[in-house]
Structures are given as structure tokens and as C-alpha cells.
Curated annotation (Swiss-Prot):
GO MF entry, a single one: toxin activity
Chief location: secreted
Family note: Belongs to the long (4 C-C) scorpion toxin superfamily. Sodium channel inhibitor family.
Span of the signal peptide: none
Tissues with expression: Expressed by the venom gland.
Pfam family name, one: Toxin_3
Protein species of origin: Anuroctonus phaiodactylus (Mafia scorpion)
Described function: Sodium channel (Nav) specific neurotoxin.
Descriptive protein name: Phaiodotoxin-2
Coiled-coil portions: none
């Protein structure tokens, strides 16, 4: 379950110093029950993002489509 961010640098998996900790904090803020981490999606031709295990389903829906900008 990915979370997105309006800041484009959010997608650059592995490019940012402290990115893993950023994902841990971001996933925790979204209500993930487990530690989040950065996950690349290059093989699928997609940008990477923070992968949050066991994210509440209502939060997941909020992070896609028209409400994508609401994710912080």
C-alpha cells in the first residue's frame, strides 16, 4: 500500500538522505501498524514511494486519484 506526496522528491526512492526514516514517519502518520519503507517500482515503469504495511483502507483510498494532494 503506497502513499504519495505532492512533493516530487518523495518519489525518488533511495535518492534522499534519510528517506527510509521519512517513510517510517510518513507511514506512521497515516496509521500504518507496521514500519514503512521506501520501495522502488522501476521494473513496472512507475515511480517509487513509501510502502506502508497494514495501512487502514480508508487512508489508502484517500491517497489516490483526486484526493492525492491531501496526503501529507
Amino acid at each position: 500500500k503506497f502513499i504519495r506526496h505532492k512533493d516530487e522528491s518523495f518519489y525518488e526512492c533511495g535518492q534522499l538522505i534519510g528517506y527510509q526514516q521519512y517513510c517510517v514517519n510518513a507511514c506512521q502518520a497515516h496509521g500504518s501498524k507496521e514500519k514503512g519503507y521506501c520501495k522502488g517500482m522501476a521494473p513496472f515503469g512507475l515511480p517509487g514511494g513509501c510502502y506502508c504495511p497494514k495501512l487502514p483502507s480508508n487512508r489508502v483510498k484517500m491517497c489516490f486519484g483526486a484526493l492525492e494532494s491531501k496526503c501529507a
